[in-house]
Amino acid sequence: MTTDSAEHTHDPILPDVAMHLVPPMKPVIGRVTESRNCMKGKSASFVRHVSIDVSGTPLEGAFRSGQSFGVIPPGVNHNDKPHKVRLYSIASPTRGEDGEGKVLATTCKRLIDEYWPQTPKDDETRHDLFTGVCSNYLCDLKVGDEVKVTGPVGKRFVLPADPARHDYLFLATGTGIAPFRGMISDLLEGHDGPVESDIHLVMGVPYTTDLLYDDQLRALADKHPNFHYHTVVSREIQSDGTKGGYIHHYLDRQIHLHETLLSGDRTLMYLCGLAGMQLGVFQFLARAGLGDPYLKVKEELQDVAPSDWDTKSMKRNVRPTHRCMLEVY
């Protein structure tokens, strides 16, 4: 939990959360209650919304939106060792998919790729198909199937204890939308009623068909005037003949929409998705003069133009503040 000074610095006071109630060495059994495609249209990717009943286990009623849980796939790896736990973001509100905290869900993308050399010792001619063990196991499960689960995990990438004290900018790429689905539901559809906070979600994808939970999010935006849903499609040609760009390009182009939000004392920023998003967003904040509430830049980088930052220097010299929550992979 943050210190009492948070009330004076506009930092969020985070709630106490349960963690590691179910360790990987002693998983519990959940049961799949739903598995459905959650993409807007036909795509080169395969992403499923998978719901798991954890009633009667320590996970029941113990997780919060923004946390993660673990899945242990059956079988052994190439060393004949049991597969290790894989973590997945919880895509459900704190009250669960069922409203009682008994069913949690995640947003799982199948990993399907070709082998490619990553070290000088790897076989350069190898190009056979590689399929992710846990993602495909999880996506293959059918309603009624049992699955070993652990968790919950995570204490910082959560909503503040008093959500109404803050406004929100959520930035997501791909399956990074998962925790925001739950958080936005908590903010707008929680038991205490919708908050009046200003809430913006920016979702970045390669193609329109890659949008996740699009119908649900648009319905929420239509119903709640304080919730604004923005999509950024990077590889499709826009009406003006240009490509859509990435999230940081969108923020730069639409700064007139977000400058007031970002400069406000109440605003919290959450980023979730591919790690490549982090550099562009941090550069945008610094370049626009909006970085102070969200970034701590070490002296080594303070006199360097943000456009000259690279991933290595950023990781070494830029840290998010308590008002910037980061979950990238």
How would you label these PLM feature ranges?
Residues 144:
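Active-site-proximal polar cores
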Residues 75-78, 150-156:
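Short, charged beta-turn/beta-strand-edge "cap" motif at the junction between a beta-strand
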Residues 160-165, 263-265:
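Short helix-loop-beta connector
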Residues 60-82, 173, 178-200:
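Classical protein tyrosine phosphatase
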Residues 2-10, 17-28, 43-45, 195-329:
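Reductase modules of NAD(P)H-dependent flavoproteins
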Residues 33-141:
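Ferredoxin-reductase
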Residues 148, 167-171:
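Conserved beta-strand elements of the Class I
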Residues 69, 147-149:
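Generic structural signal for buried aliphatic residues
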